[in-house]
């Protein structure tokens, strides 16, 4: 049964809402060994690990054009239509995030500005094997393509027969992925970080994965950039008397089925709703194929918090800083300005979180574990870098030379001062 708490200032939210985290201790040594091995032996190591972990011995790591064409020929046409629809929505949303160069001209001949450039080579990890997550392909590849990355490399584990599922290949092609490789796990992160005979080294790696992939991303950070280290999934629902208990329970369980560590929290001003949702969660749990996973999540990470008013509800939500926040209230737009910490916000009674997972348009790669207090969803910004530039005319430099020299001398950097003063010696 999901635990219900009556909120007061005496409630220790830190303790009551402590979220479980993946434990990396058991995989550190294994991941470090894999990274070193791939760095040293390249493709040979990748082929061996693919046989060991995925049960298939590959002759070629790269997906061919023939395989991609076969995917288009064999994919369920309704699914292809859904993938295209999702792609178009994601593209439309992320195009609004594009940043432009800017220029500032001053009368004394000084020109200042910023130029925006895409990260030239990016690598995307997509979970694979028997699991198909074309939405992950779209959410990572589309913003990279819009950013203008020269080369988008995708890695994903093969199935037991050495192929990649059609939905993954179709989503990749539609999104503009340039090359796809049949390799997963920590070994694929190593390949993207160091490069092999076949797989090029990239400058940034994005995409979710299991604990081995997450640990590998942590270890290679600095050699390359990474998007984020995602923790278990989470949802917090703020609900008032107008919320439907059946829908609210279903929304909690849509996250609970992800992972035994997923956090599912309802914050409500209605004791009636709290009681009904607790009963409804138990009822719906029995109807789920992934009941065991969802039940563990609900019983260990699930909470219903009853508050006196919306001020308390907002306080709890901002404290938690959830990955997904649902505002199951009559006037969500009135509440929105008060929400300071959330990855993605789902407004009103007809906006269940899975809309954001698949096709609404905003990115579903979101900060977890409270990091929404200082982090943002994946966006075009993650695939660009900005350079500032400075141009001073002789007149412009002369006007500020004494100030620069004064600053440099104050900091004890004589050579800094001389690099300016030397330009005015006769």
What are these regions (language model features)?
Residues 150-160, 264-270, 348:
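Short internal beta-strands
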Residues 2-8, 179-184, 304-309:
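Short acidic-hydrophobic, aromatic-tinged amphipathic segments that line or gate anion-handling sites
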Residues 228-300, 304:
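A conserved active-site cap/scaffold subdomain adjacent to cofactor or substrate pockets
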């Amino acid at each position: 049964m999901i635990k219900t708490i009556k909120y007061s200032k005496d409630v220790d939210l830190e303790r009551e809402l402590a979220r479980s985290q993946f434990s990396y201790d058991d995989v550190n040594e294994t991941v470090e060994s894999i990274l070193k091995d791939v760095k040293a032996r390249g493709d040979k190591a990748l082929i061996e690990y693919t046989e060991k972990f995925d049960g298939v011995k590959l002759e070629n790591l790269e997906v061919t054009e023939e395989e991609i064409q076969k995917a288009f020929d064999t994919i369920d046409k309704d699914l292809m239509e859904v993938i295209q629809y999702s792609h178009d929505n994601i593209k439309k949303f992320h195009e609004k995030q594009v940043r432009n160069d800017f220029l500032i001209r001053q009368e004394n001949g000084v020109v200042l500005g910023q130029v925006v450039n895409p990260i030239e080579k990016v690598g995307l990890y997509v979970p694979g094997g028997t699991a198909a997550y074309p939405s992950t392909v779209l959410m990572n590849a589309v913003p990279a393509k819009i950013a203008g990355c020269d080369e988008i490399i995708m890695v994903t584990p093969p199935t037991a027969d050495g192929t990649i599922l059609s939905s993954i290949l179709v989503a990749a092609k539609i999104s503009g992925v340039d090359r796809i490789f049949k390799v997963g796990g920590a070994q694929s992160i190593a390949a993207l970080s160091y490069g092999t005979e076949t797989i090029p080294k990239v400058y940034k790696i994005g995409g979710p994965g299991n604990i081995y992939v997450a640990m590998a991303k942590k270890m290679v950070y600095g050699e390359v950039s990474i998007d984020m280290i995602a923790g278990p999934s989470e949802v917090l629902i703020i609900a008032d008397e107008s919320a439907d208990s059946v829908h609210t329970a279903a929304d909690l369980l849509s996250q609970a089925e992800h992972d035994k560590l997923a956090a599912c929290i309802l914050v409500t001003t209605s004791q009636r709703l709290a009681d009904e949702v607790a009963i409804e969660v138990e009822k719906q749990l029995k109807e789920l194929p992934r009941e065991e996973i969802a039940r563990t999540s609900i019983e260990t990470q699930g909470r219903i918090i009853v508050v006196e008013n919306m001020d308390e509800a907002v306080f709890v939500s901002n404290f938690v800083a959830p990955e997904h926040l649902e505002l199951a209230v009559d006037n969500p737009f009135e509440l929105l300005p008060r929400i300071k910490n959330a990855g993605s916000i789902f407004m009103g009674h007809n906006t269940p979180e899975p809309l954001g997972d698949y096709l609404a348009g905003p990115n579903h790669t979101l900060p977890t574990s409270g990091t929404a207090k200082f982090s943002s969803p994946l966006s075009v910004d993650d695939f660009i870098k900005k350079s500032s530039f400075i141009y001073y005319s002789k007149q412009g430099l002369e006007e500020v030379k004494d100030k620069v020299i004064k600053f440099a001398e104050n900091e004890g950097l004589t050579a800094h001062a001389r690099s300016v003063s030397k330009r005015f010696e006769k």
